[in-house]
Design a protein with these regions (language model features):
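Structural signature for extended repeat/solenoid scaffolds and their inter-repeat hinge/linker regions
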Residues: 1-37
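Short, flexible, solvent-exposed loop/turn segments with mixed acidic/basic and small polar residues
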Residues: 39-47, 196-201, 478-481
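Short cationic amphipathic helices and targeting signals
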Residues: 49-56, 208-210, 488-491
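P-loop NTPase motor domains
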Residues: 156-166, 173-175, 180, 185-186, ...
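C-terminal anchoring/interaction modules
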Residues: 532, 546-580
């Protein structure tokens, strides 16, 4: 299907024409199918082309026969509704000119045809990777021009080159508040983009949090840390066996007693995320765990930790002492009239190992015990957000194990969300922006992420979340992400993900493009001034080299200044368990 195709052999040409269309037909109500075809063609790259056929043979009869076979092959492109090709005889005087233009590949404006990529590949079959054709370079994936209203300033994501015009691509602060989702296979450049974005925020004086399940991203950021922001660093590195940072999940702000309910609900969600409570827990587990947590948090004089959960269940004296100070009548009623009175399989003594087994993995682990066993967290999450700190969290699964890494990440995500929501006590226009980067975020997301994504904007908590493939996400989290995220970026993905993402990027890009885009390139559907843009492509700038001695110096300084000796912490935990 072409606009105006001319072909030649000797004195013979092709032209394209619309056949059999009366004036009434062309001016009547538009054909929906035809309009769809027009829109489809206009949405893709097109090229001005000349197409010429030249045949050389041992005699005229043979050359004419070959030519007619070639000419007849264009009949397949004819359509009653769209363009067709028609054979036209060329005058003798034009023959030499035609051969000359063919020989030197000279473009003839008078015979140009506007053909789309699909039309060109239907007429001429380009070489495949299996075809040995020298001096031919191929394009594995399409490119597209950025929108005309692309911001001139903001956070730099990379650059776009379209028809030899290079343009830097920025995203505005307000558009970032609608969150950003990044997907791509390992090694495609996601970490490079995250590092670039985070370092720009740091240099601009913004507050950021970075949850890194591998540790490499944290090292990269520390190695490039601006000198003026070193004092703003809050480094959480649980992989240090000698010195520990404290993180108490049960700690809350007394000014906001409603936080207790949020913490308990999040703790249940975290356990469900880690153990799939539908299969391994059930309503009895949730009931006992919920009331044990509420009982510990209702003591007005003491701060407890997850270490005391087994003691609530197994130590009658300890539980009775807590109940004597408990003001929550529902919690008291559960323990005094249900749990302690139950018999048979539901008896409290039978429930103890059932409940505590879910906590033993953390309590008995050398890495975890000295972190979650401290009554006071080393840092204040609200202060981290309000004071624009650089909060870096090394959750290396290789050192901690996947379960412990996930638990700490889930607790920290919950704490940051709670701190952000507590900013209801200050006017919205006085809330500082805080950017939370989460690599492999599926490890740190519970079902409440839909609430975070929908509500965090007003509290100035902006999420940048990334992972490798969609199957990592439970259906509820997947729907929450694609239903609430404003900006979607896709590096190269596999076949299944390409099919899923195609609907986000069509008609500009298809699944083949998503599967074949080069490393350090990505497709993006970006939020611009509160509106979703048409998809286009971006290439990231190459990362600069860092100073890893600086990174190690920062880690050592922070460990000596803020972390505590594990020996001292273990001794405190031992004494506390004896005293209570």
């Amino acid at each position: 299907q072409g606009k105006n195709l001319t072909q030649a052999m000797g004195a013979t040409n092709f032209i394209s024409t619309i056949k059999g269309k009366s004036e009434n037909t062309l001016t009547s109500t538009p054909d929906e199918e035809l309009l769809k075809m027009l829109r489809d063609k206009l949405s893709k790259d097109s090229f001005e082309t000349n197409i010429r056929l030249v045949v050389s043979a041992e005699n005229k009869i043979r050359s004419e026969s070959i030519f007619l076979e070639m000419a007849n092959s264009f009949v397949q492109f004819s359509s009653n509704k769209t363009n067709s090709f028609k054979l036209v005889r060329t005058k003798k005087g034009a023959f030499d000119e035609l051969i000359y233009k063919y020989s030197f590949r000279l473009f003839d404006e008078s015979q140009k045809n506007v053909l789309g990529i699909e039309e060109l590949t239907s007429i001429f079959h380009f070489p495949t990777p299996l075809t040995k054709t020298p001096n031919i370079s191929g394009v594995k994936s399409k490119v597209s021009a950025p929108p005309t209203n692309i911001p001139k300033e903001g956070l730099l994501l990379g650059y776009n080159i379209y028809r030899e015009e290079k343009k830097d691509i920025y995203i505005k602060k307000d558009d970032r508040r609608r969150h950003m989702y990044i997907i791509g296979q390992t090694g495609t450049g996601k970490s490079s983009l995250l590092s670039s974005m985070a370092l720009q925020d740091i240099k601009n004086g913004e507050g950021i949090g970075m949850l890194d399940p591998h540790g490499d991203l944290i090292d990269d950021i520390l190695s490039k840390m601006p000198e003026e922001r070193i004092e703003d660093i809050v480094l959480f590195d649980p992989t240090n066996l000698e010195r520990s940072i404290g993180l108490n999940m049960l700690e809350y702000d007394p000014r906001f007693p409603e936080q207790k309910t949020f913490i308990v609900n999040e703790m249940i969600n975290i356990l469900d995320k880690l153990y799939d409570l539908r299969q391994t827990g059930g309503p009895m587990f949730e009931q006992y765990a919920r009331n044990a947590l509420m009982l510990l948090m209702d003591d007005p004089n003491e701060i407890y930790t997850l270490m005391e959960i087994p003691k609530v269940l197994a130590d009658d004296n300890f539980r009775k002492r807590l109940l004597s100070k408990c003001k929550n009548f529902l919690v008291k009623e559960f323990w005094e009239k249900q749990a302690e009175q139950a018999g048979g399989e539901g008896a409290l003594r039978n429930m103890v190992p059932y409940i505590t087994s879910k906590f033993d993995n953390f309590i008995s682990n050398d890495y975890m015990r000295s972190i979650i066993g401290q009554t006071k967290s080393t840092f204040n999450f609200r202060e981290i957000i309000d004071s624009k700190k650089v909060f870096l969290v090394n959750l290396s699964k290789g050192r901690l194990g996947e379960l412990n890494s996930s638990l700490l990440g889930l607790i920290i995500t919950s704490k940051l969300s709670l701190a952000a929501f507590s900013r209801v006590d200050i006017p919205e226009d006085q809330r500082n922006d805080f950017y939370l980067y989460m690599d492999e975020f599926q490890n740190f997301a519970t079902n409440t992420i839909s609430t975070v994504l929908s509500e965090a904007r007003k509290y100035r908590l902006s999420l940048i979340i990334s992972h490798q493939f969609i199957a990592q996400l439970p259906e509820g989290i997947r729907d929450a992400v694609f239903g609430n995220v404003g900006t979607i970026a896709s590096f190269r993905v596999g076949a299944e993900d390409a099919k899923f993402l195609e609907k986000e990027f069509e008609p500009i890009f298809n699944s083949q493009d998503l599967m074949n885009i080069d490393n350090f390139n990505f497709y993006i559907k970006m939020m611009i001034d509160g509106q979703t843009s048409k998809p286009f492509n971006i290439k990231t700038y190459p990362p600069k080299k860092g100073d890893y001695k600086l990174a190690n110096d920062i880690k050592e300084y922070y460990s000596l200044t803020y972390a505590r000796s594990r020996y001292i912490i273990d001794e405190e935990i031992r004494r506390r368990r004896v005293d209570i």
